[in-house]
């Protein structure tokens, strides 16, 4: 059953909600809120349609629609912020920074912890929002909310672990002091595939460091960012510290340019495509801003002859089909050694047929939701057709799902070659292409033959091989006999054109801190 968001106004007494699909008249001058009438219902306070700037819910001159990717139904409309709204949000964040940076680390820690507590208290509603606007299965959405909240918990603790240094210099009457100070206003630009976790992973670190933020969420999934704003406000995060400016696809370019060029912004943190990242880097270069970027991936998944096949198949399922293959670290290229190839392909196909169920994310038992939009479906379809035309074999799947719309069958291809689009381009969909290889050196060469290097996976029971391959793979993160590698305690990021900097872990907060050296003389 599809969930439907309806924008409406609330009277002080809050009358009973109308039936799904119907609107009540809106009293003039009241703030816009949203509600959803879906499985279990949703708490109305979490569903907002306005921007959140300077601690206030503000409309924009225009709105844009948000759609349920599973049904195509309109969920509601959200403020379509443009250049004036973006500049106002930056100014609000800048004004708030002057006081927020002076708040004690203990108080910042307590506020982040309170925000975490509120996320946990509202985890079910937050998960339903994710499923409604992104399409991912509710169970996965629930997992994302817990993962998302953990970043707030983690950085609430890291706020109290921002340490400096005292250095004894070569001069007897001098000492060097090293201080860490917040960089300033951070512009946070996030993707649709993890609409909550990608915000808290960045914002948690920024606020813990003493920075203020302006968040521009993806146009497909703005409700999650606005729900987080509501909870941040309830937690007591001061006005202007956390700002959200949703905008449509048509205005994304101009808003992004403002965030990258405004002199009041000191830091850019972006998760998205490599192509968009390059554009933002170009804009940020003119004012030499601090930049963190988590960009595209083309993750190799290597299975060596020594691997435990069942374990490798389980890892492949976890790595490839989470969020229907729409994750930046999901396996894009499967490289399987000749001696184990046929067994792996057979068991992988069996696991896919047995375990994967395509459907609406709210339906019990669904493991594969829709792709985010028609363009995403067309990309997967194009890659499958290209591979088949060049000689690949469809083992299972291979076409749009019978449900129609944005659904695509989980697909396994064999007899794949390196010249196929599914090997050279990131898929971001439920497509698993398998290449057969003979030698370790060959697999490593294929894996490293990419301009990007975010994550990589391999399965082996040979200790010497494990050390060699882990060191040789040109990626920022490696999964050894493991298909799920993300953890709040560990650094997340890539090499080559997969990005700059690291998020999460003890290293994540450093992305929002400047190191200042003070020479103390005359001692």
From Swiss-Prot:
Q: Which residues carry this modification: Phosphoserine?
A: 403, 487
In chain numbering, the residues marked as site (Transition state stabilizer) are: 193
Q: In which pathway does it act?
A: Amino-acid degradation; 4-aminobutanoate degradation
Report the locations given in the UniProt record: Mitochondrion
Output one GO BP term: glutamate metabolic process
Q: Which positions are annotated as binding NAD(+)?
A: 201, 216-219, 272-277
Q: Which reaction does it catalyse?
A: succinate semialdehyde + NAD(+) + H2O = succinate + NADH + 2 H(+)
- Provide the family line: Belongs to the aldehyde dehydrogenase family.
Q: What is this protein called?
A: Succinate-semialdehyde dehydrogenase, mitochondrial
This chain's source organism reads Mus musculus
């Amino acid at each position: 059953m599809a969930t439907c968001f309806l924008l409406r106004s609330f009277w002080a007494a809050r009358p009973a909600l109308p039936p799904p699909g119907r609107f009540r008249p809106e009293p003039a001058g009241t703030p816009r809120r949203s509600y959803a009438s879906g499985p279990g219902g949703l708490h109305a306070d979490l569903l907002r349609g306005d921007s959140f700037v300077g601690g206030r819910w503000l409309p924009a001159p225009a709105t844009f629609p948000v759609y349920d990717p599973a049904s195509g139904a309109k969920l509601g409309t959200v403020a379509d912020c443009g250049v004036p709204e973006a500049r106002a949000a930056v100014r609000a964040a800048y004004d708030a920074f002057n006081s927020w940076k002076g708040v004690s680390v203990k108080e910042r820690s307590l506020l982040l912890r309170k925000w975490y507590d509120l996320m946990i208290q509202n985890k079910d509603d937050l998960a339903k929002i994710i499923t409604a606007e992104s399409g991912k299965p509710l169970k996965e959405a629930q997992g994302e909310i817990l993962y998302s909240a953990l970043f707030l918990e983690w950085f609430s603790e890291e706020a109290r672990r921002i340490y400096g240094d005292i250095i004894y210099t070569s001069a007897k009457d001098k000492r060097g002091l090293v201080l860490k100070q917040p960089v300033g206003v951070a512009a946070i630009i996030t993707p649709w595939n993890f609409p909550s976790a990608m915000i808290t992973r960045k914002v948690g670190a920024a606020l813990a460091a003493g920075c203020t933020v302006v968040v521009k969420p993806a146009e497909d999934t703005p409700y999650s960012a606005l729900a987080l704003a509501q909870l941040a406000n309830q937690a007591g995060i001061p006005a202007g510290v956390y700002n959200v400016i949703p905008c449509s696809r048509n205005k994304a370019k101009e808003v992004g340019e403002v965030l990258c060029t405004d002199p009041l912004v000191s830091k850019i943190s972006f998760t998205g495509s490599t192509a968009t990242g390059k554009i933002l880097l170009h804009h940020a270069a003119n004012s030499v801003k601090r930049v963190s970027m988590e960009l595209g991936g083309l993750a190799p998944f290597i299975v060596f002859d020594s691997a435990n096949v069942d374990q490798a198949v389980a890892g492949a399922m976890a790595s490839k089909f989470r969020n229907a293959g729409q994750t930046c670290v999901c396996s894009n290229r499967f490289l399987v050694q000749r001696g184990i190839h046929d067994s792996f392909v057979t068991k992988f196909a069996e696991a896919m047929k047995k375990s994967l169920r395509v459907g609406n994310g709210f339906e019990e038992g669904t493991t594969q939701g829709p792709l985010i939009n028609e363009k995403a479906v067309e990309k997967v379809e194009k890659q499958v057709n290209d591979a088949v035309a060049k000689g690949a074999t469809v083992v299972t799947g291979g076409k749009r799902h019978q449900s129609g719309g944005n659904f695509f069958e989980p697909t396994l291809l064999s007899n794949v070659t390196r010249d196929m689009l599914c090997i050279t381009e990131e898929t971001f969909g439920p497509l698993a292409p398998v290449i057969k290889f003979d030698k370790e050196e060959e697999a490593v060469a294929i894996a490293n033959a990419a301009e990007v290097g975010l994550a990589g996976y391999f399965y082996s029971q040979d200790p010497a091989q494990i050390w060699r391959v882990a060191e040789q793979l040109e990626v920022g993160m490696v999964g050894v006999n493991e298909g799920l590698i993300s953890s709040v305690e560990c650094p997340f990021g890539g090499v080559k054109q997969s990005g700059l900097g690291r998020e999460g872990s003890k290293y994540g907060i450093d992305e929002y801190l400047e190191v200042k050296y003070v020479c103390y003389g005359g001692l």
